[in-house]
Protein backbone atom coordinates (compact mmCIF):
# COMPACT_ATOMS: atom_id res chain seq x y z
CA UNK A 1 0.00 0.00 0.00
CA UNK A 2 1.34 3.42 -0.96
CA UNK A 3 2.22 5.64 1.98
CA UNK A 4 0.08 8.77 2.16
CA UNK A 5 0.37 12.23 3.61
CA UNK A 6 -2.38 13.67 5.78
CA UNK A 7 -3.44 15.83 2.85
CA UNK A 8 -3.62 12.79 0.56
CA UNK A 9 -5.88 11.01 3.05
CA UNK A 10 -8.24 13.95 3.50
CA UNK A 11 -8.46 14.51 -0.24
CA UNK A 12 -9.32 10.88 -0.94
CA UNK A 13 -11.93 10.86 1.85
CA UNK A 14 -13.79 13.73 0.18
CA UNK A 15 -13.24 13.17 -3.54
CA UNK A 16 -16.66 12.52 -5.09
CA UNK A 17 -15.41 12.10 -8.64
CA UNK A 18 -12.41 12.98 -10.80
CA UNK A 19 -12.97 14.95 -14.00
CA UNK A 20 -11.29 14.62 -17.37
CA UNK A 21 -9.43 17.92 -16.93
CA UNK A 22 -7.69 16.63 -13.79
CA UNK A 23 -9.88 18.49 -11.33
CA UNK A 24 -12.10 16.77 -8.79
CA UNK A 25 -15.48 17.29 -7.21
CA UNK A 26 -14.87 17.57 -3.45
CA UNK A 27 -17.52 17.20 -0.76
CA UNK A 28 -17.59 19.94 1.89
CA UNK A 29 -18.44 19.03 5.48
CA UNK A 30 -18.57 22.47 7.10
CA UNK A 31 -19.27 25.91 5.66
CA UNK A 32 -18.74 29.01 7.80
CA UNK A 33 -20.27 32.31 6.69
CA UNK A 34 -19.75 35.97 7.56
CA UNK A 35 -21.24 39.23 6.38
CA UNK A 36 -18.71 40.31 3.73
CA UNK A 37 -18.53 37.45 1.21
CA UNK A 38 -22.01 35.95 1.58
CA UNK A 39 -24.61 38.53 0.38
CA UNK A 40 -24.19 37.89 -3.36
CA UNK A 41 -24.12 34.13 -2.75
CA UNK A 42 -27.48 34.19 -0.99
CA UNK A 43 -28.89 36.44 -3.70
CA UNK A 44 -27.74 33.91 -6.29
CA UNK A 45 -29.72 31.20 -4.50
CA UNK A 46 -32.82 33.38 -4.54
CA UNK A 47 -32.52 34.23 -8.22
CA UNK A 48 -32.15 30.54 -9.09
CA UNK A 49 -34.93 29.44 -6.76
CA UNK A 50 -32.57 27.19 -4.81
CA UNK A 51 -32.29 26.29 -1.15
CA UNK A 52 -29.13 25.27 0.74
CA UNK A 53 -28.33 21.60 0.13
CA UNK A 54 -27.52 20.99 3.81
CA UNK A 55 -28.69 23.72 6.14
CA UNK A 56 -27.05 22.03 9.14
CA UNK A 57 -23.61 22.15 7.52
CA UNK A 58 -23.59 25.95 7.71
CA UNK A 59 -23.00 28.34 10.59
CA UNK A 60 -22.61 32.11 10.43
CA UNK A 61 -21.46 35.08 12.47
CA UNK A 62 -20.67 38.73 11.65
CA UNK A 63 -17.09 39.76 12.40
CA UNK A 64 -15.38 42.04 9.86
CA UNK A 65 -17.66 45.06 10.14
CA UNK A 66 -18.88 44.94 13.72
CA UNK A 67 -17.86 47.77 16.08
CA UNK A 68 -15.94 46.76 19.19
CA UNK A 69 -16.81 49.42 21.77
CA UNK A 70 -19.43 48.47 24.35
CA UNK A 71 -21.52 51.58 23.65
CA UNK A 72 -21.70 50.84 19.94
CA UNK A 73 -22.56 47.19 20.52
CA UNK A 74 -25.32 48.04 22.96
CA UNK A 75 -26.85 50.25 20.28
CA UNK A 76 -27.33 47.24 17.99
CA UNK A 77 -27.34 47.45 14.20
CA UNK A 78 -28.21 51.15 14.20
CA UNK A 79 -24.97 51.90 16.04
CA UNK A 80 -22.89 50.77 13.04
CA UNK A 81 -22.07 54.18 11.61
CA UNK A 82 -20.82 53.11 8.18
CA UNK A 83 -23.81 52.48 5.93
CA UNK A 84 -22.21 49.67 3.91
CA UNK A 85 -20.99 47.90 7.04
CA UNK A 86 -24.40 48.16 8.66
CA UNK A 87 -26.10 46.85 5.53
CA UNK A 88 -23.77 43.84 5.34
CA UNK A 89 -24.42 42.82 8.94
CA UNK A 90 -28.16 43.37 8.55
CA UNK A 91 -28.19 41.38 5.31
CA UNK A 92 -26.44 38.42 6.96
CA UNK A 93 -29.09 38.43 9.69
CA UNK A 94 -31.88 38.48 7.12
CA UNK A 95 -30.32 35.81 4.90
CA UNK A 96 -29.71 33.42 7.77
CA UNK A 97 -33.26 33.95 9.02
CA UNK A 98 -34.71 33.39 5.54
CA UNK A 99 -32.71 30.23 4.80
CA UNK A 100 -32.79 28.76 8.31
CA UNK A 101 -29.03 28.93 8.90
CA UNK A 102 -27.71 29.09 12.45
CA UNK A 103 -26.18 32.51 13.10
CA UNK A 104 -24.47 33.90 16.17
CA UNK A 105 -25.63 37.47 15.73
CA UNK A 106 -23.71 40.58 16.72
CA UNK A 107 -24.68 40.58 20.39
CA UNK A 108 -24.95 36.82 20.87
CA UNK A 109 -22.44 35.71 23.52
CA UNK A 110 -21.17 33.11 21.03
CA UNK A 111 -20.44 35.73 18.33
CA UNK A 112 -16.88 36.35 17.28
CA UNK A 113 -14.35 35.98 14.51
CA UNK A 114 -15.30 33.05 12.27
CA UNK A 115 -11.95 31.29 12.77
CA UNK A 116 -12.25 31.51 16.54
CA UNK A 117 -15.94 30.60 16.75
CA UNK A 118 -15.77 27.48 14.53
CA UNK A 119 -13.17 25.63 16.62
CA UNK A 120 -14.47 26.70 20.03
CA UNK A 121 -17.95 25.48 19.12
CA UNK A 122 -16.61 22.15 17.89
CA UNK A 123 -18.01 22.96 14.46
CA UNK A 124 -14.52 22.30 13.16
CA UNK A 125 -13.69 18.62 13.61
CA UNK A 126 -10.73 16.44 12.59
CA UNK A 127 -11.09 14.94 9.13
CA UNK A 128 -13.53 17.56 7.90
CA UNK A 129 -13.36 19.69 4.81
CA UNK A 130 -14.00 23.25 5.98
CA UNK A 131 -14.49 26.31 3.78
CA UNK A 132 -15.34 29.95 4.37
CA UNK A 133 -15.28 33.08 2.24
CA UNK A 134 -12.09 34.19 3.95
CA UNK A 135 -8.48 33.37 3.11
CA UNK A 136 -7.55 32.58 6.72
CA UNK A 137 -9.80 29.53 6.78
CA UNK A 138 -6.53 27.57 6.80
CA UNK A 139 -6.71 28.15 10.59
CA UNK A 140 -9.03 25.15 10.93
CA UNK A 141 -6.35 22.83 9.53
CA UNK A 142 -4.87 22.78 13.03
CA UNK A 143 -7.43 20.04 13.75
CA UNK A 144 -6.28 17.71 10.99
CA UNK A 145 -8.93 19.18 8.70
CA UNK A 146 -8.67 20.19 5.05
CA UNK A 147 -9.60 23.86 5.26
CA UNK A 148 -9.22 26.79 2.90
CA UNK A 149 -10.79 30.04 1.84
CA UNK A 150 -13.16 30.41 -1.10
CA UNK A 151 -14.59 33.25 -3.18
CA UNK A 152 -18.16 34.50 -3.22
CA UNK A 153 -19.19 32.45 -6.27
CA UNK A 154 -17.88 29.34 -4.51
CA UNK A 155 -19.81 30.29 -1.37
CA UNK A 156 -22.94 30.06 -3.51
CA UNK A 157 -21.82 26.71 -4.98
CA UNK A 158 -21.29 25.21 -1.53
CA UNK A 159 -24.63 26.49 -0.28
CA UNK A 160 -26.37 24.99 -3.30
CA UNK A 161 -24.50 21.70 -3.76
CA UNK A 162 -22.27 21.07 -0.71
CA UNK A 163 -19.43 20.46 -3.18
CA UNK A 164 -16.61 22.33 -4.90
CA UNK A 165 -14.48 21.69 -7.96
CA UNK A 166 -10.79 21.78 -7.09
CA UNK A 167 -7.42 20.52 -8.27
CA UNK A 168 -5.22 18.56 -5.94
CA UNK A 169 -2.18 20.44 -4.69
CA UNK A 170 1.36 19.29 -4.02
CA UNK A 171 2.56 18.36 -0.53
CA UNK A 172 4.84 20.66 1.47
CA UNK A 173 6.09 19.74 4.92
CA UNK A 174 7.57 22.29 7.31
CA UNK A 175 9.41 20.49 10.12
CA UNK A 176 10.33 22.38 13.27
CA UNK A 177 12.36 20.22 15.62
CA UNK A 178 13.63 21.02 19.09
CA UNK A 179 12.35 23.10 21.98
CA UNK A 180 11.23 26.71 21.69
CA UNK A 181 13.21 29.08 23.94
CA UNK A 182 11.41 31.13 26.60
CA UNK A 183 9.51 34.04 25.08
CA UNK A 184 9.29 32.46 21.62
CA UNK A 185 5.80 31.51 20.46
CA UNK A 186 3.79 29.94 17.66
CA UNK A 187 3.54 33.38 16.03
CA UNK A 188 7.32 33.60 15.95
CA UNK A 189 7.52 30.15 14.37
CA UNK A 190 5.23 31.01 11.51
CA UNK A 191 6.81 34.43 10.91
CA UNK A 192 10.22 32.74 10.82
CA UNK A 193 8.90 30.18 8.33
CA UNK A 194 7.53 32.93 6.09
CA UNK A 195 10.80 34.82 6.39
CA UNK A 196 12.62 31.68 5.24
CA UNK A 197 10.45 30.52 2.32
CA UNK A 198 8.79 33.81 1.36
CA UNK A 199 5.18 34.61 0.64
CA UNK A 200 5.30 32.47 -2.52
CA UNK A 201 7.09 29.52 -0.94
CA UNK A 202 3.93 27.48 -0.49
CA UNK A 203 2.23 28.32 -3.78
CA UNK A 204 0.37 25.32 -5.16
CA UNK A 205 0.98 23.27 -2.01
CA UNK A 206 -0.89 22.02 1.01
CA UNK A 207 1.39 22.79 3.94
CA UNK A 208 1.68 20.37 6.85
CA UNK A 209 3.49 21.59 9.96
CA UNK A 210 5.33 18.79 11.75
CA UNK A 211 8.17 18.12 14.15
CA UNK A 212 8.62 18.05 17.91
CA UNK A 213 8.22 21.82 18.34
CA UNK A 214 4.88 21.72 16.53
CA UNK A 215 3.65 18.75 18.57
CA UNK A 216 4.53 20.67 21.73
CA UNK A 217 2.26 23.56 20.77
CA UNK A 218 -1.21 23.87 22.24
CA UNK A 219 -4.19 23.73 19.88
CA UNK A 220 -4.34 27.51 20.02
CA UNK A 221 -0.70 27.73 18.96
CA UNK A 222 -1.37 25.32 16.11
CA UNK A 223 -4.27 27.49 14.98
CA UNK A 224 -1.91 30.47 14.87
CA UNK A 225 0.60 28.76 12.59
CA UNK A 226 -2.07 27.29 10.30
CA UNK A 227 -3.78 30.68 10.15
CA UNK A 228 -0.74 32.22 8.46
CA UNK A 229 -0.01 29.39 6.02
CA UNK A 230 -1.74 31.57 3.43
CA UNK A 231 0.88 34.28 4.07
CA UNK A 232 3.45 31.63 3.10
CA UNK A 233 1.56 31.12 -0.17
CA UNK A 234 -0.26 27.92 0.85
CA UNK A 235 -4.07 27.98 0.84
CA UNK A 236 -4.06 24.94 3.12
CA UNK A 237 -2.16 24.56 6.39
CA UNK A 238 -2.56 21.60 8.71
CA UNK A 239 -1.28 19.69 11.71
CA UNK A 240 -1.86 15.97 12.24
CA UNK A 241 -4.31 14.78 14.88
CA UNK A 242 -3.02 13.76 18.29
CA UNK A 243 -4.39 13.50 21.84
CA UNK A 244 -4.31 17.30 22.23
CA UNK A 245 -6.63 17.62 19.25
CA UNK A 246 -9.09 15.10 20.65
CA UNK A 247 -9.03 16.60 24.15
CA UNK A 248 -9.74 20.08 22.77
CA UNK A 249 -12.77 18.93 20.78
CA UNK A 250 -14.33 16.73 23.47
CA UNK A 251 -17.53 18.11 24.98
CA UNK A 252 -17.90 21.07 22.64
CA UNK A 253 -21.42 21.86 21.38
CA UNK A 254 -21.01 20.43 17.87
CA UNK A 255 -18.77 17.50 18.85
CA UNK A 256 -20.12 13.94 18.54
CA UNK A 257 -21.53 12.29 21.66
CA UNK A 258 -21.64 8.73 23.03
CA UNK A 259 -21.00 5.93 20.54
CA UNK A 260 -20.61 8.48 17.74
CA UNK A 261 -17.76 10.05 19.69
CA UNK A 262 -15.96 6.72 20.09
CA UNK A 263 -16.29 5.96 16.38
CA UNK A 264 -15.10 9.44 15.45
CA UNK A 265 -12.04 9.25 17.68
CA UNK A 266 -11.05 5.91 16.16
CA UNK A 267 -11.08 7.53 12.72
CA UNK A 268 -9.39 10.73 13.86
CA UNK A 269 -6.39 8.85 15.22
CA UNK A 270 -5.61 7.69 11.67
CA UNK A 271 -5.35 11.28 10.43
CA UNK A 272 -1.58 11.50 10.39
CA UNK A 273 0.93 11.31 7.57
CA UNK A 274 2.34 7.81 7.19
CA UNK A 275 5.91 7.48 8.44
CA UNK A 276 7.29 6.87 4.95
CA UNK A 277 4.99 9.29 3.12
CA UNK A 278 6.69 11.38 0.45
CA UNK A 279 6.45 15.17 0.31
CA UNK A 280 7.20 17.22 -2.78
CA UNK A 281 9.09 19.76 -0.66
CA UNK A 282 10.43 19.66 2.89
CA UNK A 283 11.58 22.74 4.82
CA UNK A 284 13.35 22.35 8.16
CA UNK A 285 13.92 24.76 11.06
CA UNK A 286 15.44 24.33 14.51
CA UNK A 287 13.25 25.69 17.27
CA UNK A 288 16.28 26.79 19.28
CA UNK A 289 17.32 29.12 16.45
CA UNK A 290 14.03 31.05 16.42
CA UNK A 291 13.87 34.39 18.23
CA UNK A 292 10.96 36.81 18.73
CA UNK A 293 10.09 38.13 15.29
CA UNK A 294 9.06 41.60 14.07
CA UNK A 295 7.98 42.47 10.54
CA UNK A 296 9.51 45.71 9.30
CA UNK A 297 8.07 46.07 5.78
CA UNK A 298 4.93 45.73 3.71
CA UNK A 299 4.88 41.97 3.24
CA UNK A 300 4.92 39.23 5.91
CA UNK A 301 8.19 37.91 4.45
CA UNK A 302 9.84 41.22 5.40
CA UNK A 303 10.55 40.03 8.91
CA UNK A 304 13.60 39.80 11.16
CA UNK A 305 14.42 38.87 14.74
CA UNK A 306 14.09 41.50 17.47
CA UNK A 307 17.88 41.78 17.83
CA UNK A 308 18.41 42.53 14.15
CA UNK A 309 18.17 45.59 11.92
CA UNK A 310 16.06 46.78 9.05
CA UNK A 311 17.83 45.58 5.87
CA UNK A 312 19.92 47.80 3.64
CA UNK A 313 18.76 47.73 0.00
CA UNK A 314 22.33 48.45 -1.10
CA UNK A 315 23.32 45.01 0.18
CA UNK A 316 20.70 43.25 -1.98
CA UNK A 317 22.05 41.91 -5.29
CA UNK A 318 18.68 41.12 -6.86
CA UNK A 319 17.37 44.37 -8.44
CA UNK A 320 13.72 43.38 -7.99
CA UNK A 321 14.20 42.63 -4.30
CA UNK A 322 16.27 45.79 -3.90
CA UNK A 323 13.46 47.90 -5.34
CA UNK A 324 10.96 46.14 -3.09
CA UNK A 325 13.04 46.92 0.00
CA UNK A 326 13.42 50.56 -1.03
CA UNK A 327 9.69 50.96 -1.59
CA UNK A 328 8.89 49.32 1.75
CA UNK A 329 11.37 51.52 3.63
CA UNK A 330 9.82 54.62 2.10
CA UNK A 331 6.26 53.58 2.93
CA UNK A 332 7.17 52.48 6.46
CA UNK A 333 9.19 55.60 7.20
CA UNK A 334 12.25 53.58 8.21
CA UNK A 335 15.93 53.89 7.37
CA UNK A 336 18.33 51.19 6.22
CA UNK A 337 20.13 49.42 9.07
CA UNK A 338 17.79 50.90 11.69
CA UNK A 339 17.70 48.61 14.75
CA UNK A 340 14.26 47.08 15.26
CA UNK A 341 14.35 48.27 18.87
CA UNK A 342 14.52 51.87 17.63
CA UNK A 343 11.17 51.65 15.84
CA UNK A 344 8.82 53.82 17.87
CA UNK A 345 5.13 53.06 17.87
CA UNK A 346 1.83 54.94 17.93
CA UNK A 347 -0.68 52.15 18.53
CA UNK A 348 -0.81 48.52 19.63
CA UNK A 349 -3.40 45.95 18.57
CA UNK A 350 -3.81 42.59 20.30
CA UNK A 351 -6.47 40.56 18.51
CA UNK A 352 -7.43 39.06 15.09
CA UNK A 353 -8.08 35.48 13.98
CA UNK A 354 -4.34 34.86 14.43
CA UNK A 355 -3.96 35.83 18.08
CA UNK A 356 -7.17 36.59 19.98
CA UNK A 357 -7.74 33.36 21.89
CA UNK A 358 -7.46 32.92 25.64
CA UNK A 359 -3.86 31.70 25.49
CA UNK A 360 -2.89 34.83 23.53
CA UNK A 361 -4.59 37.13 26.02
CA UNK A 362 -2.92 35.35 28.93
CA UNK A 363 0.49 35.82 27.32
CA UNK A 364 -0.11 39.53 26.75
CA UNK A 365 -1.53 40.01 30.25
CA UNK A 366 1.53 38.35 31.79
CA UNK A 367 3.63 41.12 30.24
CA UNK A 368 1.20 43.94 31.01
CA UNK A 369 0.68 43.00 34.66
CA UNK A 370 2.07 45.66 36.99
CA UNK A 371 3.14 47.86 34.09
CA UNK A 372 1.65 50.87 32.30
CA UNK A 373 1.17 51.61 28.61
CA UNK A 374 3.85 54.13 27.60
CA UNK A 375 2.73 57.75 27.43
CA UNK A 376 3.80 57.93 23.79
CA UNK A 377 1.34 55.21 22.76
CA UNK A 378 -1.89 56.80 21.52
CA UNK A 379 -3.97 53.64 21.87
CA UNK A 380 -3.50 50.03 22.94
CA UNK A 381 -6.40 47.74 22.06
CA UNK A 382 -7.15 44.25 23.31
CA UNK A 383 -9.95 42.63 21.31
CA UNK A 384 -11.01 39.08 22.28
CA UNK A 385 -11.77 36.74 19.39
CA UNK A 386 -15.23 35.80 20.62
CA UNK A 387 -17.76 36.48 23.33
CA UNK A 388 -16.78 33.22 25.01
CA UNK A 389 -13.09 34.14 25.00
CA UNK A 390 -14.02 37.53 26.46
CA UNK A 391 -16.08 35.93 29.22
CA UNK A 392 -13.30 33.49 30.11
CA UNK A 393 -10.71 36.27 30.17
CA UNK A 394 -12.92 38.33 32.46
CA UNK A 395 -13.46 35.34 34.74
CA UNK A 396 -9.67 35.07 35.03
CA UNK A 397 -9.29 38.80 35.71
CA UNK A 398 -7.33 39.49 32.54
CA UNK A 399 -9.53 42.45 31.63
CA UNK A 400 -8.60 44.16 34.91
CA UNK A 401 -4.90 43.61 34.23
CA UNK A 402 -5.22 45.24 30.82
CA UNK A 403 -7.40 48.11 32.05
CA UNK A 404 -5.09 48.82 34.99
CA UNK A 405 -2.17 48.97 32.56
CA UNK A 406 -3.96 51.45 30.29
CA UNK A 407 -5.16 49.13 27.52
CA UNK A 408 -8.68 49.35 26.10
CA UNK A 409 -10.78 46.20 26.62
CA UNK A 410 -13.14 45.69 23.70
CA UNK A 411 -15.99 43.55 22.39
CA UNK A 412 -15.18 40.70 19.95
CA UNK A 413 -14.61 41.25 16.24
CA UNK A 414 -11.94 41.55 13.56
CA UNK A 415 -11.25 45.11 14.73
CA UNK A 416 -7.97 46.73 13.67
CA UNK A 417 -6.75 43.75 11.63
CA UNK A 418 -8.30 45.42 8.60
CA UNK A 419 -9.80 48.82 7.85
CA UNK A 420 -13.44 47.69 7.55
CA UNK A 421 -14.72 48.99 10.90
CA UNK A 422 -14.06 52.00 13.14
CA UNK A 423 -10.76 50.61 14.52
CA UNK A 424 -8.16 52.01 12.11
CA UNK A 425 -4.69 53.50 11.95
CA UNK A 426 -4.11 57.07 10.89
CA UNK A 427 -1.76 57.82 8.02
CA UNK A 428 1.87 57.43 9.03
CA UNK A 429 1.10 55.69 12.32
CA UNK A 430 3.14 52.65 13.36
CA UNK A 431 1.29 49.76 14.99
CA UNK A 432 2.57 46.66 16.77
CA UNK A 433 -0.10 44.20 15.70
CA UNK A 434 -0.80 40.54 16.42
CA UNK A 435 -2.68 40.22 13.12
CA UNK A 436 -1.49 38.47 9.96
CA UNK A 437 -0.99 41.03 7.18
CA UNK A 438 1.12 44.16 6.92
CA UNK A 439 0.26 45.29 3.39
CA UNK A 440 0.11 48.98 2.55
CA UNK A 441 -3.11 50.40 3.99
CA UNK A 442 -4.22 47.12 5.56
CA UNK A 443 -5.04 48.74 8.91
CA UNK A 444 -5.97 52.12 7.47
CA UNK A 445 -4.81 54.38 4.64
CA UNK A 446 -1.13 55.14 5.16
CA UNK A 447 -0.97 52.95 8.28
CA UNK A 448 2.25 51.10 9.04
CA UNK A 449 1.84 47.59 10.45
CA UNK A 450 4.43 45.52 12.31
CA UNK A 451 3.46 41.87 12.91
CA UNK A 452 4.41 40.39 16.29
CA UNK A 453 3.27 37.91 18.93
CA UNK A 454 0.89 38.94 21.74
CA UNK A 455 3.72 39.01 24.27
CA UNK A 456 5.85 41.18 21.99
CA UNK A 457 2.92 43.51 21.34
CA UNK A 458 2.31 43.97 25.05
CA UNK A 459 6.02 44.57 25.64
CA UNK A 460 6.00 47.22 22.92
CA UNK A 461 2.94 48.87 24.46
CA UNK A 462 4.56 49.33 27.86
CA UNK A 463 7.89 50.41 26.33
CA UNK A 464 6.73 52.69 23.52
CA UNK A 465 8.97 50.88 21.06
CA UNK A 466 9.96 47.32 20.23
CA UNK A 467 11.85 45.48 22.95
CA UNK A 468 12.87 41.87 23.43
CA UNK A 469 10.15 40.47 25.67
CA UNK A 470 12.66 37.95 27.01
CA UNK A 471 14.53 40.80 28.69
CA UNK A 472 11.56 42.08 30.68
CA UNK A 473 11.66 41.00 34.29
CA UNK A 474 8.95 39.47 36.46
CA UNK A 475 6.75 37.94 33.75
CA UNK A 476 4.53 35.23 35.20
CA UNK A 477 3.76 32.39 32.79
CA UNK A 478 0.92 29.88 32.95
CA UNK A 479 1.17 26.29 31.84
UniProtKB/Swiss-Prot annotation:
CDD domains for the chain: IPMI (cd01583)
Positions contributing to [4Fe-4S] cluster binding: 353, 414, 417
Cofactor(s) this protein requires: [4Fe-4S] cluster
PROSITE patterns listed in its UniProt record: ACONITASE_1, ACONITASE_2
EC number: 4.2.1.33
Enzyme class: lyase
Record text on cofactor binding: Binds 1 [4Fe-4S] cluster per subunit.
Molecular function GO terms recorded: 3-isopropylmalate dehydratase activity; 4 iron, 4 sulfur cluster binding; metal ion binding
InterPro entries linked to this entry: 3-IsopropMal_deHydase_lsu (IPR004430), Acnase/IPM_dHydase_lsu_aba_1/3 (IPR015931), Acoase/IPM_deHydtase_lsu_aba (IPR001030), Aconitase_4Fe-4S_BS (IPR018136), Aconitase_4Fe-4S_dom (IPR036008), IPM_dehydratase_rel_enz (IPR050067), IPMI_cat (IPR033941)
Pfam family, one: Aconitase
Associated pathway: Amino-acid biosynthesis; L-leucine biosynthesis; L-leucine from 3-methyl-2-oxobutanoate: step 2/4
Chemical reaction(s) catalysed: (2R,3S)-3-isopropylmalate = (2S)-2-isopropylmalate
Example GO BP: L-leucine biosynthetic process
Subunit structure: Heterodimer of LeuC and LeuD.
NCBIfam families given in the database record: leuC, PRK05478.1, PRK12466.1
PANTHER family xrefs: 3-ISOPROPYLMALATE DEHYDRATASE, HOMOACONITASE, MITOCHONDRIAL-RELATED
HAMAP family linked: LeuC_type1 (MF_01026)
Protein's name in the database: 3-isopropylmalate dehydratase large subunit
Organism, scientific name: Xanthomonas campestris pv. campestris (strain ATCC 33913 / DSM 3586 / NCPPB 528 / LMG 568 / P 25)
